[in-house]
């Protein structure tokens, strides 16, 4: 997901996106531990997306205060 797309979302949408990414990370981690994950780079992409969403979310919450 691109930063431009993330910045356009509202705080509520970002929280929903964050929950979806955390769920996806959990599922990928389980697959990785069971040695069923063929594309291990997906785990890194999800982690990066979580960090981006958290950063933008913190910026937006700081703007509101």
Swiss-Prot record:
InterPro entries: Ribosomal_protein_uL29, Ribosomal_uL29, Ribosomal_uL29_sf
GO cellular component: cytosolic large ribosomal subunit
Record's keyword terms, sorted: Ribonucleoprotein, Ribosomal protein
One Pfam family of this chain: Ribosomal_L29
GO MF: structural constituent of ribosome
Taxonomic superkingdom: Bacteria
GO terms under biological process: translation
Gene3D superfamilies named among the record's database cross-references: 6.10.140.1970
Protein family according to the UniProt entry: Belongs to the universal ribosomal protein uL29 family.
Protein name per UniProt: Large ribosomal subunit protein uL29
Organism, as annotated: Buchnera aphidicola subsp. Baizongia pistaciae (strain Bp)
High-level lineage: Bacteria, Pseudomonadati, Pseudomonadota, Gammaproteobacteria, Enterobacterales
